[in-house]
């Protein structure tokens, strides 16, 4: 890894006093920043945090927000406009939150984390852990959008932040701190969601949550909080983030993890907790934690949570897995920690905290190594976790996933615990909710013989170019349902395929001619010499091109759509200008240009007609003003030659 140094130069020597005075205000202290030799002018500094502020004297390191966009809204550091510099309060290793983020990002949208050295006005302030800010940059990284609405439910969110329905008024949601500007209408969405969660009968909860909550993501998030003994929704019903995406679905996200892998002393943790022994279903009977209280009463959701808990523990909670990461981090920051005179604990506490637990007589501080080893032992041998379940041994895909075709999947189940129900889950789009399809062991779905433990089902036909995500769930019967998933990470790591466009066998439309570098052949309606594609209708009837597509990318066959009302007459030719100027008035202008070095151009049928490939041309390098055209016209194999736009070749 890389340990970067942030050189901060404040405008005033009294910067600490100013930052104290402006704590929890909108005022930032101005400064300049140098990183990797590059100067970032007019940044802003603010103290952040709660206990990491009040329990620390100003002469020791406090947590700091660095705002790159304090004056210049476009200024960013390596793509990010806000830096969260955390002081390692209550963590002499500085590593807990970075490790937590590293693991969590395998299962949920979670913050990136690393370490930096900070120098202020020429004086070293030592090592800080650096955790990504919960802002629009985070949304873009994880949800591929900058839209939606963000809430933070702080440590003091308590009763009004637990997602229990608090009442009709916005003021009743006092624990929710909205982080998105100009989003008043989102309060009604939150109001309706908490009311639904409060009122929905258990028998209808699954249906009510579909499309309103990322259920699988919420269960992964709860499992992570339990495993790492995090002070979040799982324990205290606060100290978490909530995100409402542009499609109206809520996501339960992590807020911080500075006290994970320990025994936090705040509210919410069970009294008398000794060591890494937080129960896997702690708070499951607590009506003031409605997300768990309700979901854990739905047998298959409780089984899904149990599976996720076990999966994370088996994949990550092992010193063979965590140990090398700890050693790598320690090697990166050890020398600076040793020299750091602003840290809150000793260098000896840093080294000891990696591999040993310690006690001051009042409170035990768990070392990273003993926590990892003992937590794994506790959870994997816990009677609520170590339950027999069906096993999905393998998945077979029968079809290749072309447009206008379904995609058959066969799952083979094994083990002593019979799979009573097997479900194929699928979704298209990056953030779409999954749709369940019942799988059958009846010998009629490519599944061998009836009753042999093989189950088959089809993903319905999808639009060409769509990336389809899917996985399979096998559920047991019995009083305490258990589940298995293939792949094990379910929605956090599904199988995928991209739908390919199938070829039509009777198309009367032809790509007749292309020019990939037009310098003098023909001008478009705007007077520009642009690349062009010529299509010809070889039939004796007028054809409506509305909703059909042109593309130069077989992974995106629906790239440019013919506008509504576009027709081509019998025997006629039509020119489409490939100039990336789709909004130009007059003529047809595609949203891509041609590559004179060579590529493939496809004419794709409409969504309603299955996105079949009506015609395609693959061309090699073309010279300026050279055409690639069919000879004889509209019928022959294409070859290089002289252009004749709008006329017979």
What are these model-predicted stretches?
Residues 405-409, 529-531:
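Structural beta-strand segments of beta-rich domains
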Residues 409-418, 428-430, 476, 537:
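Extracellular acidic, Ser/Thr/Pro-rich low-complexity tracts
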Residues 445-458, 572-575, 582-584:
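Aromatic sugar-binding surface patches on proteins
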Residues 1-94, 99, 411, 415:
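Conserved NTP-binding catalytic cores of kinases and kinase-like/nucleotidyltransferase enzymes
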Residues 63-73, 80, 87-88, 106-111, ...:
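Internal "kinase-insert"/substrate-recognition segments embedded within catalytic cores
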Residues 3, 14, 23, 38, ...:
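Middle-to-C-terminal accessory/interaction subdomains
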Residues 362, 366-391, 395, 464-649:
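Intrinsically disordered, low-complexity linkers and terminal tails enriched in Ser/Thr/Pro/Gly
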């Amino acid at each position: 890894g890389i340990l970067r140094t942030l050189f901060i130069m404040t405008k005033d020597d009294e910067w600490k006093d100013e930052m104290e005075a402006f704590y929890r205000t909108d005022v930032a202290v101005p400064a300049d920043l140098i990183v990797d030799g590059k100067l970032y002018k007019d940044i802003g500094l603010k103290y952040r945090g709660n206990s990491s502020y009040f329990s620390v004297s100003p002469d020791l390191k406090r947590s700091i927000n660095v705002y790159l966009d304090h004056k210049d809204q476009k200024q960013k550091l390596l793509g990010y406009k806000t830096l969260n510099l955390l002081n390692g309060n209550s963590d002499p290793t500085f590593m807990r939150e970075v490790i937590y983020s590293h693991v969590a990002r395998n299962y949920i949208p979670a913050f990136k984390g690393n370490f930096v050295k900070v120098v202020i006005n020429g004086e070293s302030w030592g090592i800080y852990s650096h955790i990504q800010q919960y802002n629009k940059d985070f949304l873009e990284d994880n949800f591929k959008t900058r839209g939606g609405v963000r809430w933070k439910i702080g440590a003091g969110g308590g009763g009004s932040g637990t997602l229990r329905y608090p009442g009709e008024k916005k003021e009743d949601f006092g624990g929710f701190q909205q982080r998105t500007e100009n989003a008043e209408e989102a309060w009604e969405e939150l109001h309706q969601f908490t009311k639904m969660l409060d009122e929905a009968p258990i028998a209808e909860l699954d249906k009510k949550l579909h499309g309103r909550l990322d259920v699988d993501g919420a269960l992964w998030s709860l499992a992570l909080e339990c495993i790492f003994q995090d002070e979040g929704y799982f324990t205290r019903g606060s100290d978490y983030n909530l995100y409402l995406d542009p499609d109206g679905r809520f996501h339960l996200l992590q807020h911080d993890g500075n006290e994970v892998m320990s025994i936090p002393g705040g509210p919410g943790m069970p009294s008398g907790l000794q060591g890494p022994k937080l129960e896997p279903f702690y708070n499951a009977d607590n009506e003031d934690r409605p997300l768990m209280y309700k979901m854990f009463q739905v047998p298959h959701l409780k089984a899904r949570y149990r599976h996720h808990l076990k999966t994370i523990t088996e994949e990550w909670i092992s010193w063979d897995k965590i140990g090398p990461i700890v050693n790598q981090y320690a090697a990166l920051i050890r020398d600076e920690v040793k020299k750091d005179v602003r840290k809150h604990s000793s260098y000896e506490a840093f080294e000891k905290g990696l591999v040993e637990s310690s006690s001051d007589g009042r409170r035990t501080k768990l070392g990273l190594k003993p926590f990892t080893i003992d937590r794994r032992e506790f959870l994997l041998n816990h009677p609520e976790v170590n339950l027999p379940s069906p096993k999905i041994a393998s998945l077979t895909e029968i079809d290749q996933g072309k447009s206008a075709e379904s995609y058959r999947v066969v799952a083979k189940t094994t083990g002593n615990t019979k799979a009573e129900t097997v479900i194929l889950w699928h979704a298209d789009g990056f953030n779409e909710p999954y749709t369940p399809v019942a799988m059958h062991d009846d010998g009629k779905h490519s599944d061998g013989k009836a009753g042999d433990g093989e189950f088959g089902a089809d993903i319905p036909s999808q639009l060409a170019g769509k990336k389809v995500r899917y996985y399979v769930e096998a559920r047991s019967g019995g009083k305490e349902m258990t589940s298995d998933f293939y792949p094990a990470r379910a929605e956090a790591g599904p199988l995928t395929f991209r739908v390919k466009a199938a070829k039509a066998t009777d198309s009367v439309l032809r790509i007749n001619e292309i020019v990939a570098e037009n310098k003098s052949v023909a001008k478009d309606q705007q007077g520009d010499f642009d690349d062009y594609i010529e299509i010809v209708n070889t039939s004796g009837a007028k054809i409506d091109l509305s909703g059909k597509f042109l593309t130069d990318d077989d992974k995106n066959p629906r790239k440019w759509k013919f506008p509504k009302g576009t027709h081509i007459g019998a025997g006629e030719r039509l020119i489409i200008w490939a100039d990336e100027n789709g909004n130009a008035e007059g003529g047809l202008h595609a949203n891509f240009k041609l590559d004179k070095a060579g590529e493939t151009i496809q004419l794709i049928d409409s969504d309603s007609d299955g996105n079949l490939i009506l015609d395609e041309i693959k061309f090699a390098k073309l010279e300026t003003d050279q055409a690639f055209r069919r000879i004889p016209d509209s019928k022959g194999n294409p070859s290089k030659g002289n252009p004749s736009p709008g006329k017979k070749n």
